[in-house]
Structures are given as C-alpha cells and as structure tokens.
C-alpha cells in the first residue's frame, strides 16, 4: 500500500496547477501550428505531436495544423527519376513536379498526420488549400513555375470544423484563377491561414532554438521593429529570414503573436502555450 506521494507526482500536480492561468487564457483560442522537418518521419515524435494537438483540443484550444513535406517530396521525385532544380533555395516546380508534390503532401504526409491524431483519440480531417476554395494563389515567381503565394484565404471550412471539435490538418497547396495547382511554402501557408483566422498564436516549429542575437543567445521576446533592425544589421540571416518574414506579415495582419519554436524539444507546443518561459522566440507587432 502506498502511503505517500512521490516527488514526480507532486511535481506533476504543481505543473498542472501552474498551467491554470494559461489554460484559461487560451480557452477557445485559435492556434495555428506549422509542423514539418524530421519529426514527420519519426513515429515517436509524430505520436508525441499528435498527443499535444489532442490535448489542446481537449482543454478548449482550436488547433490548426499546417504541414510541410520537403524530405518526402525529394524522396519521391528521386524514386520517379525527376530531377529537382532549385533557384535561390526554392524548388522550381514544373507540371510534372507539382503533380508529385500534391501526391506526397495530400496523399501521404497529410493522411499520416491525420491518422496519428485520430489514433490518440482526437478527430482530425485532412485538407489542402484547394478544398472549399481555402487558398487562392498567384504565381510567386514565373521562373519558379507552379510555386504560389496566397492571394486570398477563405477560412469558412476551418470554422465549420471547429464547430464539430475537429482538428484541421492542411497541406500547403492552393489553386490559381484557372484552377491550376500551386505548391506553397509551408510557413507562408500557415501565416496566411493564421491571418485569415485572426489567430491568437502562430507557432512555427523548426530545428533551431529560436531567434538569436549577435552574441548567439536566444531572444525570447521581440517586436516587429526589433526584427527589422536585426535583419538590417545581419544578425538575422540565412534560413531564419523567411521565417521572420512570415512572422512579421502575420503579426502585422491581425495575429496576436508568432512564436518560432524549437520543435526538437519534447512537448514544445505545450511548453510554449502553458508555461511562463515558453519554448522559443515570440514576435509581436
């Protein structure tokens, strides 16, 4: 017979108690999460992410998952003998390539995330930006082919899913004025959807610890002006630039805050939303 609580049990109870103000703050909040990278190929990390999404829904948060799929796309193109060409770090997407992109994103990656969430007791539905006219695109750059930038987002289908406690899982595809399919950068798609929903939070999960200052330390809170200055002086560079561009666009168009989150940290989404110190770099307007 057990006669006393273990330290672990006490720590768990204390953590739950400390989370209460954050649970209250985010009740009925909309949180858009960009999920991608190596975690999508790891069963344990996928299951952990799925549990976090189900928990969010159970405590009254409305999560929206937008995913990438670059590594899987590269693998499939290689199997089919289609050579990938990149221009300034962006994939040139011709007609043959966009068909493969759609097949992988909508048919493989999207459904894997949906299944993972459902397996954890949640209810998820997979969509792409082509469904219900969710994302309308214009060409990002004629030289990139079928790579699009969102020109209009109609979030009504997402709001309908919220009413039935369903977690939307969205592949970053859109359609043009003539019905053509466009591949969209996952961060860009997530930002556009967050803006259309006027989301409380946009979380960009990545494989770095956050935005770093000149000394190499993670900056936990920044304003849009801070980000502009750090880009101008070269402190923010390389792959962090497009992520901060997405963040700035989002917070300047109605999203309350965007957080660049270290997705390698277990339960990073929960840590960011429900603890005092979070798990990344928060950017506000």
Swiss-Prot record:
- Keywords attached to this entry: Amino-acid biosynthesis, Arginine biosynthesis, ATP-binding, Cytoplasm, Kinase, Nucleotide-binding, Transferase
Where is this protein primarily located? Answer: cytoplasm
Transferase as UniProt keyword = yes
The EC number(s) given in the record are 2.7.2.8
Q: In which pathway does it act?
A: Amino-acid biosynthesis; L-arginine biosynthesis; N(2)-acetyl-L-ornithine from L-glutamate: step 2/4
The record's listing under CDD domains reads:
AAK_NAGK-C
Q: Name one Pfam family in it.
A: AA_kinase
Q: Which InterPro entries does the record associate with it?
A: AceGlu_kinase-like_sf, AcgluKinase_fam, ArgB, Asp/Glu/Uridylate_kinase, Glu/AcGlu_kinase, NAGK-C
What the protein does comes down to:
Catalyzes the ATP-dependent phosphorylation of N-acetyl-L-glutamate.
Q: What is this protein called?
A: Acetylglutamate kinase
Organism of origin is Jannaschia sp. (strain CCS1)
């Amino acid at each position: 017979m057990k006669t006393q609580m273990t330290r672990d049990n006490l720590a768990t109870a204390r953590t739950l108690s400390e989370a209460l103000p954050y649970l209250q703050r985010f009740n009925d909040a909309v949180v858009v999460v960009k999920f991608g990278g190596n975690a999508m190929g790891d069963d344990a990390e996928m299951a952990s992410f799925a549990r976090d999404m189900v928990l969010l829904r159970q405590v009254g948060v409305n999560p929206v998952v937008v995913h990438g799929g670059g590594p899987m796309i590269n693998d499939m193109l290689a199997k089919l003998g289609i050579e990938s060409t990149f221009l300034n770090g962006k994939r040139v997407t011709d007609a043959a390539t966009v068909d493969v992109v759609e097949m992988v994103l909508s048919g493989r990656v999207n459904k894997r995330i949906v299944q993972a969430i459902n397996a954890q007791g949640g209810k998820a539905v997979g969509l792409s930006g082509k469904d219900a006219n969710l994302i309308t695109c214009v060409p990002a750059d004629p030289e990139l082919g079928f790579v699009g930038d969102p020109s209009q987002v109609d979030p009504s289908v997402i709001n309908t899913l919220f009413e039935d406690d369903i977690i939307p899982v969205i592949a970053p595809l859109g359609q043009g004025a003539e019905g053509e399919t466009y591949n969209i950068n996952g961060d860009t798609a997530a930002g556009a959807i967050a803006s259309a929903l006027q989301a409380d939070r946009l979380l960009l999960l990545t494989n770095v610890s956050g935005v770093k200052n000149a000394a190499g330390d993670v900056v936990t809170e920044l304003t849009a002006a801070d980000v502009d200055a750090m880009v101008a002086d070269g402190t923010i560079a390389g792959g962090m630039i497009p992520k901060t561009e997405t963040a700035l666009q989002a917070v300047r168009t109605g999203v309350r805050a965007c957080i660049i989150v270290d997705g390698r940290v277990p339960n990073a989404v929960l840590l960011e939303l429900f603890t005092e110190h979070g798990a990344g770099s928060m950017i506000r307007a």
